[in-house]
């Protein structure tokens, strides 16, 4: 059926139930950017909140070793899933571009190809995780007192990868048409399931890290079921039919062109963080646990930046498809402003009240000391990540995914590895190890911003 525009909303014709889709091509922008980004931010923050509750349950009702085992896996998990999560971003951009071009005939092929890729990538990660869990933790130098627990958690965690990928790709499809609410609702439900299962498995059944892993798998299954249901009951051309799952070569090519550079960037970025985690491991279990505690709050702040970065990807994607330079410029400015202010305020709030927030996770003085250092050195400057996330998001929306990928790999990955191999090897100091984060953010942000302005001038000249 024909889709038409009414009062800034995409709707099907009056013979069917109205489907609310945000019109990113016309009208005011600030309110729409906020309406799009806030559910995204809430989605990620709620997910992290639920994960933090699970981590706190492990720390309070299991042991410091169990807490360290769970915390030591965050960079490994990120390393192994970011490539495929980046590919899901490719489906978002491709669909957004088609919407901007008003080409609804090719959208169904992208939708069904994306879900097929989600299934294949999830199964691949499930199998890979079982084989590499222990070797990669050994390579990272995980302490002997936690390595067996960390391996167990990681192997259980990856059992849920097919469901995680189905949610990730499905949510990306919905966001491409302006729907950020239903992915949020799905995560709220799965987050509640995660907390309940954590309490059941860890507190009642005393399963420790195994219980935490099983709770995460249960939550992933819950979110995947919901997102697939939403897509199967969506209106054309987004509606999913399991019988129509396919691998369309043209769609795969376009998705991978955008998604692979973004995924590789995230993968190399995560690899650098794995190396930094190895440096953290060298300070012992207290440093690992303290860093894990701070990371919970660091994620909260970063997810605000990431929400606005995802927002500008979709908004820029549609408006670049429509060749609207004025709106593309405004999208960049508003996205950057919202990202810096929101992340900066939340980060400073956490830093000011750090004693209370750290105390929610641990009473161990040694763990507390390391957590405070990371709060002060890293979280204070978290808003700097906006510089490369927002500009890079706009470039991806323009279909130029390789440029921000290369620059971010150099600025935030190569530099960190050089820092580890030189400064941190000369001076075994936790503060110097943490300092690489704000330093790399400044360098990366400067390079990606320059690339954004140069690319935009060329595209619209």
Q: Which residue ranges define each predicted feature?
A:
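Short alpha-helical transmembrane segments in multi-pass integral membrane proteins
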Residues: 1-37, 95-160, 204-260, 316-381, ...
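Residue-level signal for short hydrophobic patches within transmembrane helices
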Residues: 26, 30-49, 53, 76-83, ...
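Residue-level signal for transmembrane alpha-helical positions in Major Facilitator Superfamily
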Residues: 34, 38, 50, 87, ...
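Transmembrane helical elements of multi-pass membrane transporters/channels
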Residues: 35-54, 156, 167, 190, ...
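Helix-terminus/linker motif at the lipid-water interface of multi-pass membrane proteins
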Residues: 49-68, 137-144, 200-207, 267-296, ...
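Small-residue-rich hydrophobic transmembrane alpha-helices
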Residues: 55, 67-127, 164-183, 277, ...
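Hydrophobic transmembrane alpha-helices of multi-pass small-molecule transporters
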Residues: 79-82, 194-198, 224-228, 300-303, ...
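Short runs within selected transmembrane alpha-helices of multi-pass transporters and secretion channels
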Residues: 88, 157-175, 183-194, 212-227, ...
């Amino acid at each position: 059926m024909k889709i038409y525009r009414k009062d800034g909303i995409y709707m099907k014709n009056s013979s069917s139930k109205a489907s609310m889709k945000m019109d990113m091509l016309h009208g005011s922008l600030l309110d729409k950017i906020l309406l799009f980004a806030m559910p995204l931010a809430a989605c990620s923050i709620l997910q992290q909140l639920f994960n933090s509750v699970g981590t706190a349950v492990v720390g309070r009702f299991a042991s410091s070793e169990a807490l360290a085992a769970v915390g030591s896996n965050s960079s490994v998990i990120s390393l192994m899933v970011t490539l495929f999560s980046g590919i899901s971003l490719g489906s978002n951009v491709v669909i957004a571009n088609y919407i901007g071009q008003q080409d609804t005939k090719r959208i169904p092929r992208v939708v069904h190809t994306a879900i097929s890729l989600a299934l294949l990538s999830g199964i691949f990660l499930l199998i890979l995780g079982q084989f590499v869990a222990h070797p990669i933790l050994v390579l990272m130098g995980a302490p002997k007192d936690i390595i067996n627990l960390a391996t167990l958690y990681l192997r259980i965690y990856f059992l849920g990868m097919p469901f995680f990928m189905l949610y990730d790709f499905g949510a990306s499809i919905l966001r491409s048409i302006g729907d950020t609410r239903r992915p949020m609702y799905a995560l709220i439900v799965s987050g509640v399931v995660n907390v309940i299962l954590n309490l059941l498995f860890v507190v009642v059944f005393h399963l420790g890290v195994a219980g935490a892993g099983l709770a995460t798998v249960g939550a992933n299954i819950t979110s995947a079921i919901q997102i697939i249901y939403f897509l199967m009951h969506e209106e054309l051309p987004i509606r999913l039919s399991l019988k129509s799952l396919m691998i369309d070569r043209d769609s795969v090519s376009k998705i991978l062109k955008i998604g692979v550079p973004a995924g590789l960037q995230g993968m190399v970025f995560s690899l650098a963080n794995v190396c930094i985690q190895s440096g953290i491991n060298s300070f012992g279990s207290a440093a690992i646990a303290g860093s894990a505690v701070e990371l919970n709050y660091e994620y909260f702040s970063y997810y605000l930046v990431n929400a606005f970065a995802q927002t500008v990807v979709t908004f820029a994607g549609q408006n670049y498809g429509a060749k609207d330079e004025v709106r593309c410029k405004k999208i960049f400015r508003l996205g950057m402003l919202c990202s810096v202010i929101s992340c900066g305020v939340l980060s400073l709030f956490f830093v000011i009240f750090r004693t209370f927030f750290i105390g929610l996770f641990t009473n161990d003085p040694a763990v507390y000391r390391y957590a405070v250092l990371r709060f002060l050195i890293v979280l204070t400057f978290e808003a700097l990540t906006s510089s490369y996330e927002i500009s890079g998001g706009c470039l991806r929306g323009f279909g130029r995914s390789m440029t921000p990928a290369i620059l971010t790999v150099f600025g935030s990955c190569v530099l960190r590895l050089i820092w580890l191999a030189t400064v941190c090897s000369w001076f075994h100091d936790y503060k110097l190890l943490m300092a690489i984060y704000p330093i790399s953010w400044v360098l990366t942000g400067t390079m990606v911003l320059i690339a954004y302005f140069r690319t935009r001038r060329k595209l619209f000249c």
